[in-house]
C-alpha cells in the first residue's frame, strides 16, 4: 500500500464572514491564519462566505448576498441599452 496517499485531516475553525459565525470542524484545508478557540487552543482559520448560519434555506430569511458583484456584472452585460 502506498504511503502518504491521503491528505492529513486537521481540526480547523470555519468562520462565516457574512454573519461573523464560527464553528469547529475537521478538514484537509490548510491556512496560515490561526485563531484561539473557546477551549484555549489555537486552530487554523478557514474563512467561508456562506454557512448554515447565513444561508437562506437554514435561516428562513431571503436576502441578497452579492459578495462578488455578480448582479452588477449581469446588469452591465445584459441590461437595457
From Swiss-Prot:
Listed GO CC annotations: ribonucleoprotein complex; ribosome
SUPFAM superfamilies: L28p-like
Domain of life: Bacteria
Entry keywords, A to Z: Ribonucleoprotein, Ribosomal protein
UniProt family annotation: Belongs to the bacterial ribosomal protein bL31 family. Type B subfamily.
UniProt-recorded Gene Ontology molecular function terms: structural constituent of ribosome
Descriptive protein name: Large ribosomal subunit protein bL31B
Assembly: Part of the 50S ribosomal subunit.
Biological process per Gene Ontology, one example term: translation
PROSITE patterns: RIBOSOMAL_L31
Stored PANTHER family: 50S RIBOSOMAL PROTEIN L31, CHLOROPLASTIC, LARGE RIBOSOMAL SUBUNIT PROTEIN BL31A
Amino acid at each position: 500500500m502506498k504511503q502518504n496517499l491521503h491528505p492529513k485531516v486537521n481540526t480547523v475553525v470555519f468562520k462565516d464572514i457574512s454573519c461573523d459565525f464560527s464553528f469547529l470542524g475537521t478538514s484537509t484545508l490548510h491556512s496560515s491564519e490561526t485563531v484561539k478557540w473557546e477551549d484555549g487552543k489555537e486552530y487554523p482559520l478557514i474563512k467561508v462566505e456562506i454557512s448554515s448560519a447565513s444561508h437562506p434555506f437554514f435561516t428562513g430569511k431571503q436576502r441578497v448576498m452579492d459578495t462578488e458583484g455578480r448582479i452588477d456584472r449581469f446588469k452591465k452585460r445584459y441590461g437595457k441599452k
